[in-house]
Every structure is written in C-alpha cells, then in structure tokens.
Amino acid sequence: MLKQVEIFTDGSCLGNPGPGGYGAILRYRGREKTFSAGYTRTTNNRMELMAAIVALEALKEHCEVILSTDSQYVRQGITQWIHNWKKRGWKTADKKPVKNVDLWQRLDAALGQHQIKWEWVKGHAGHPENERCDELARAAAMNPTLEDTGYQVEV
C-alpha cells in the first residue's frame, strides 16, 4: 500500500514580475515538513509551480498524494493542458512556446511515480494550511536569496 501524503502549496510575488517566493507543507502521519525559498526576480506563476515541484521532489518513494493549491494555473495546467502541450512539442494551441516550460517539464518529471489528486482551494479564504504556505511564500519573497535562472523577460 502506498504512503498517503498531503501537500499544500502557495507562491507569492511582490510585483509581477518581481521578488518572489514559494511555500509548501508536506504532511505524512501527522508530521509536517515545510519548504520555502525566495527569488530575486520571478513571477507568481513560477513560484506556484516551484512550490509543488519542491514538495513532490522531496518524496523518496511512490506515494498517494493529495496536493492542494490555490493556483488554477497549476491545477489546470497539470490536469488539462499539459497533455496537449507535450503532444505538440511543448507548444500551445496557437503554436506559441509554453510559458514556464522548464518548470512544467520539471513538474511532469516529479509526478511520474506518484498517484496524485489535485485539489483547488480558494486563496486568502481562511484555509489554515494555505494561509501558512502564503506566509512562508511572502516571507521568502521579502528576503530573496536565489536567482530564478529559468525566468525569461517577455518582450
């Protein structure tokens, strides 16, 4: 039987683009581990993706995961859009390159071994774990120490 894990995630950006951060909580059998980091220049969507990626990459074996995010971009991207992006060679329906492709590919690789149920929660609506992730993400964004090397300025 697979281990059952809960993951809660959030991303934050002070300006968009601007300094940003992510926060994630991984819960297994009542124990929690938190993750957060801040980047000097990024976007909110990249930080939302990073939160999910980092938490999933921390799992050491196959797990059954319930992943809660307040990002429709992440949830819809991974449950609906990614299949066609991959078929089209990481292009959108109008043949443009997928934004944040580096992170979508990393997220796709991180989910390979897990059974994942994606849940959307309304942000800033009193969901305790989402609020904690938001606090982690905001604190990280206020003290950014990393460079988001995959971030590309849109022209």
Swiss-Prot record:
Gene3D superfamilies: Ribonuclease H-like superfamily/Ribonuclease H. It is found in: Cytoplasm. It catalyses: Endonucleolytic cleavage to 5'-phosphomonoester. InterPro entries: RNase_H, RNaseH-like_sf, RNaseH_domain, RNaseH_sf, RNaseHI. This is Ribonuclease HI. Disruption phenotype: In a strain that encodes a retron, the msDNA is abnormally sized. Mg(2+) 2 binds at D10, D134. The gene is rnhA. The keyword Magnesium applies.
